[in-house]
Every structure is written in C-alpha cells, then in structure tokens.
Amino acid sequence: MKTRRTFIQSTALASAGLLASKSFAFSIGNKHAKPDELIIGHNGFTYKVDHGWAKISASTHPVNNCHEMVQDSQGRLILIGDDTRNNILIFDKSGQLLDSWGTSYPAGHGLSISKENGEDFLLIVDNGFYTDLSGAGKSQPGNVIKTNTKGRIIFTLPQPHAIGAYKDDEGYHPTETAIAPNGDIYVADGYGSDYILHYDSKGRFIRKFGGRKNDNKEHNLYCAHGVAVDTRDKDNSVLICTSREECCFKVFTMDGKFIKRIDTPGMHVCRPVMHGQHLYAGVCWSNDKEGKQLDGSGFLTIIDTNFKVLASPGGTAPVYKNGVLQQTFQHESKVFRHGHDVCVDEDDSIYVAQWNANRTTPIKLTRV
C-alpha cells in the first residue's frame, strides 16, 4: 500500500512546480455547475464550495502543502504548511491574510491550539521529512514546538530517544498533537513508530502506547496520523487515534487502554477534529471499487456521537447494511485532492487543508 510516509521518503513532493487547477463538478440538482457553484454533502450536512476563499498571492505568500488549520479565540484561522517562506498563515473568516510567520519548519505538519490564562498557544509539529533546495527528499528526527500565536517559542518537547522512551532503531516522525483539558499533551508519531506519546503540560514524559508490536493487534496503530481528546461525555473523556493504513479510528482511555475500533471503509482518514457533538476528518485517500488506493483522491467525513457516519462531503453518501458501514468512494465531481485536515468554525463552515494538491490554498465549505 502506498502511504504518505513512503511517498515522502522516495521522492520530492509531487506538487512542486505544478500549476493549480480546478475540475468541474456536479451540484445537487445542477449537473452543469462550475466548481464554486457546487453544493456537496448528505443528510442535512450540505455545503457550498469556495475554492477562492484564501486571498493571497503566490508570489508573496506561497504555499506548498497545506497541512492543518485551527481557529484561535479571536476567530482567526491559522494554517500550517511546509513552505519555509511562511510556515504559518493567519486569515480572517473572509479569507483576508492578517499575518504570516515561520521560516524554520521545513516539514511543518501538525497544528493544535490551547488557551492558558487568557492567551492562545500553538503546538507545531515538524515531522522531519522535507525537500531540500535541489528537490531531493531528506529525513531527520521530528520535533514538537510550543509557541504563542506570534511565533515565540515557549519550549520544545524532548524527543523520545533522548529520554529513553525509544530504542535506537525506532524512528521519530510525529505528525500531530492533542491537548487535554488538564494541559497534558499527546503526540501522534504517525510517520515514525506509530506510538502515542503522553507528556504533562510542562513537557515531562509520562508514557507511550500504541505502536505496531502489541500482542493484541487491535491495540496497534498503523500510520497513527492524528489524535484528539473527545470530551463529549464530560465524565468520561477518551482519546480518538487515527490508524490511517487500516482506514479506521481507535478509541483509548486517557491513559492508553484500548476501548474500541471505528471502521471507515475506503477512507484513509487523517486526524479527528471534534466540533460540537460531531467528529470531522479529512480523507487523504480513497479507494476504487477493487480496494486499490487512488492517487489524487479524497474527501471529508462527518461522524456522530455513536460513531455513525452522517455525511461524506466530496464522497458518496454513507450506506449501512445490517448496521455495518459499506465502502465510501470519492464522488465523480472530484472536489478534493488529498483532504488532509479540516477546521470547523462557529457557523459550521469547514475549511479544508489539502496535501499534494498543486499548491492550492484551503477550500471553504459554507453550510447551506
């Protein structure tokens, strides 16, 4: 199976130098709709597509891969990418650029946000895979860095080799983080050894779990691309972890004990994003009807509190048979190319960051 990890290791990013393009698509009730007239979604979760939301110039604020987005307490949308001319781009909800910074994260990938004593802080993940000036793919251990929203570094989490948490032959290429209500930090080592690393709020290591070598294979993670704290049950918070190569999420207790598996057939899901009573996720790849992973594919998915898929914008409508979700496919409209992350605002609009998508900026979906 082709994974993003092997893709990065074997070649420079395919998006370099390509021109942005938009494919025409079908709208609900209008099969001749142009891309920005398109309505996508299912079961009341329907959205108008806006490819031109981000009002930036490629000459002054270029993007390579748009990886993750969060919204701060001021309502601003913060994007991380891997172009070191501006790793961080900050927009208002209309798509106007408000600020940009960051020149030292060549593999800028993960972005989470927390609020402490009235101030917003970011956790930036550099996964360690990057492309040098000659276009060659390179690798180094990754890092997780806490900053404020202006880019001032607060601390860097210790790498697991330095604290005896990893063996010498275990790779460390983190992809994403989650922050618990008590400030504890969970790091998903999705392109490395597939552990979830647990630190306290000061960056002191507590434990690790997951990986690929458990006696019970259900406890394993394969491309542990994302992690989120699910607080919908106020008395029983849990961790939702991505196992992207298995097309599923796995649920663990806050101290790493396995609870259950949530299958998403045909959906190579990225990080879970909690918003209200729903889980949202980008689907970085989807499969064809023979189960083969499709390049240039992907969509989004929306899941309820019972872990039932309600809608897959950009994909086919969810179908259940005898309570079992059937495979979901990319819709023929092909709205998305490698949906890597979503950010959902207070109006239920969704901002979609895409990887390897011809240097395109985030797409906005306005709920209708």
Please state what every model-predicted region is.
Residues 28-50:
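Blade/loop signatures of beta-propeller domains
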Residues 54-60, 154-168, 172, 206-219, ...:
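Surface-exposed loop and turn segments in beta-propeller and other repeat-based domains
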Residues 59-74, 105-118, 130, 163-182, ...:
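Beta-rich, blade/repeat-based domains predominating
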Residues 267-316:
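Loop/turn-rich, solvent-exposed surfaces of beta-rich toroidal or solenoidal domains
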Residues 338-368:
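Blade-level signature of beta-propeller repeat domains, shared across WD40, Kelch, NHL, RCC1
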